[in-house]
A protein has these predicted regions:
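Helical hinge/lid and interdomain linker segments adjacent to catalytic or ligand-binding clefts
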Residues: 20-23, 28-32, 62-72, 122-230, ...
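Catalytic cores of eukaryotic secretory-pathway lumenal/extracellular enzymes that build
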Residues: 183-184, 198-199, 206, 238-241, ...
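Extracellular ligand-binding/catalytic regions of CAZymes and related secreted enzymes
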Residues: 21-63, 243, 341-422
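Alpha-helical scaffolding within the catalytic cores
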Residues: 97-102, 146-148, 357-361
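Hydrophobic targeting/anchoring helices
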Residues: 20-127
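Catalytic beta-strand/loop cores that center a nucleophilic Ser/Cys/Thr
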Residues: 127, 134, 231, 261-385
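Bacterial N-terminal signal peptides that target proteins for export
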Residues: 1-8
Length: 422
């Protein structure tokens, strides 16, 4: 690794033309591959090259010191780059610094260490985050219950949760898939893992994992969750010491008054929701706006949500999380597709919504020293991803606005913002 860094520094010093001081990676409509552009930013950070994220400038562009190796790698990956002189970079920063424009520059200084919470066994659906990180060539580690309970989370900066059920109800797939081989094997594996780690029920293990994740965020970690993970995580926290699992999930009936015993103060984002007590219903709670309700008024052709616009100079965190080359994003479904506004705590910040339908799609908040971000839906380029569908081929969607939201979150932990003078 030291040899790699020294070699790269030699490139940085020796291969920099006097007239070409910076590389600009535009993130507007001129960019050929938005997704791999994030990978180039990460690639530079890995080699200790500082990256400046130009918020709201040409779609949230990246700028860094010129190196022949960086330009060559960018072009090799199909990423559009512009070689600019020192004077041009100064002019860009001057334009951004103007108090009358809604732009800002944020320094990215260190490549975040990334963990994805996912079982080692193969389940019949894809994970949008691992798909896009693999496509963008951003490295990550896979961790699951054994590693989390062993205490590895504090060694990471960023943790992703996707299609996971932290309530111990196996994704509420019992109604449709209880006789499927993959479901039978998943239940068997989950139960064996719980017993191995000293728990009598899967729900007890998952709650312990939730507490480890909570402590990770409290200590300064960055949590990003999609699909069923956001609501199942908060439901599990609210249901601490409450049995919300019916007999087919844990061998005994749920508590008759389980709903009344929920403690919403333990949740990150949600409140006042009702849990689903029907074991055959493919829903965890009323946090999600269920598909049957949505499909009365919405379909693939008219399903969109809008990113909020924030003050880049003062609200730089939500501004980073909403960088895009369009403010209108095509919707996509999941076990949890959209969050009901009346179940969202006032402390949570809404990043995107479909106002007409009253749907919140993208949420952010703080917990302790860290932050969490929740995004509804399963796969931004597969409108209704079914069990058994093949993974999305991202080479067909190199400019996906929905996948850009995921990648914004991956670079977010690398940011260091200068304090404004008052």
């Amino acid at each position: 690794m030291l040899k790699l860094k020294l070699t790269f520094l030699l490139f940085l010093v020796a291969a920099m033309p006097a007239w070409a001081s910076y590389l600009l990676i535009p993130m507007d409509e001129t960019q050929r591959n938005h997704l791999k552009a994030y990978g180039i930013a990460y690639y530079a950070l890995q080699r200790e090259v500082e990256v400046t994220w130009l918020l709201n400038y040409r779609g949230g562009s990246f700028m860094m010191k010129y190196a022949d190796a960086l330009e060559r790698e960018s072009r090799l990956r199909g990423v559009t780059v512009e070689v600019i002189a020192d004077g041009q970079s100064t002019a860009i920063l001057s334009e951004i610094a103007d108090a009358s424009v809604n732009m800002d520059a944020v320094r990215l200084q260190k490549a975040p260490k990334i963990a994805v919470y996912s079982p080692k066994t193969k389940l019949p659906w894809d994970d949008a985050v691992t798909l896009v990180m693999t496509y963008a060539e951003i490295p990550y580690d896979v961790v699951y219950d054994e590693e989390v309970m062993a205490g590895v989370l504090p060694t990471y900066d960023w943790l992703h949760l996707h299609h996971e059920d932290f309530t111990g109800q196996y994704g509420k797939f019992w109604g449709n898939y209880r006789n499927a081989q993959w479901y039978i094997e998943d239940v068997r594996d989950q139960e064996a893992r719980a017993h191995k780690l000293g728990f009598s029920k899967v729900s007890q293990l998952k709650l312990a994992v939730c507490h480890k994740i909570r402590d990770f965020v409290m200590g300064g970690g960055f949590l990003f969750a999609m699909c069923s993970a956001p609501d199942s995580y908060d439901v599990a926290l609210a249901a601490e010491n409450v049995d919300i699992c019916d007999v087919m999930f844990d061998g005994d009936p749920m508590q008759p008054n389980a709903q009344e015993l929920l403690d919403f103060s333990k949740c990150f984002a949600f409140k006042d929701f009702r849990i689903s007590t029907n074991p055959a219903e493919y829903e965890i709670s009323t946090i999600d706006i269920d598909d049957r309700s949505r499909m009365k008024t919405i379909n693939e052709k008219n399903d969109f949500f809008t990113l909020f616009e924030f003050s880049a100079k003062w609200d730089w965190v939500p501004t980073m999380l909403t960088q895009n080359h369009t403010r209108i994003i095509h919707g996509f479904m999941g076990q949890t597709t959209a969050f009901r506004r009346n179940t969202i705590k006032s402390s949570a910040l809404v990043l995107a919504e479909n106002k007409e339908l009253g749907e919140v799609r993208y949420l952010h908040g703080e917990y302790g020293k860290g932050t969490w971000t929740f995004l509804g839906g399963h796969d931004p380029e597969d409108y209704r991803h079914f069990v058994g569908d093949p993974p999305t081929d991202l080479s067909l969607y190199p400019n996906s606005p929905g996948y850009r939201l995921i990648l914004n979150n991956i670079l977010f932990p690398a940011a260091k913002k200068e304090k404004h003078k008052t």
